[in-house]
């Protein structure tokens, strides 16, 4: 992540921070946090730093994998189980601990989170320009290298799968396998075996 570019794009926003409430499925969340959390978690970007708030279940992994400056868990805010109200109380406390009284959220951010934070005195504005997406669109040299490495690995995996399938025979009448089944080394060539070759 290019923090200088991010700061430049967020500089004209009035709020104290930029907040995401999403899982790894959200490209902005993955980009900003560097964490592949399957369940939604909070990422706050404020004063040039990235702060995460994750469940206790994901805490250890987030500490080692995330690119955040700080990682905190729900239990740090006396929340482990509870409903929406308690969860949002925790969110507001997390923001205030970081000196944040106002946030900008992306246009696809959860309205439930935004409304509940407003009820707790946190100002929430929607970043209708989706600035984080614009930052993600321009890759750093390191990101370009990572994309290139991933592409090379994917191409090698596909070549291996193609070779496995190309080297297979088709079962005929009288073979141990049903006619028309692909065989490799005398055994049916299953999707699981192809997947193993790819991985």
Task: Describe each model-derived feature in a short phrase.
Residues 92-199:
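Flexible, acidic/His-enriched mid-domain "rim/lid" segments that flank
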Residues 1-94, 139:
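N-terminal accessory/capping or targeting/presequence segment of soluble
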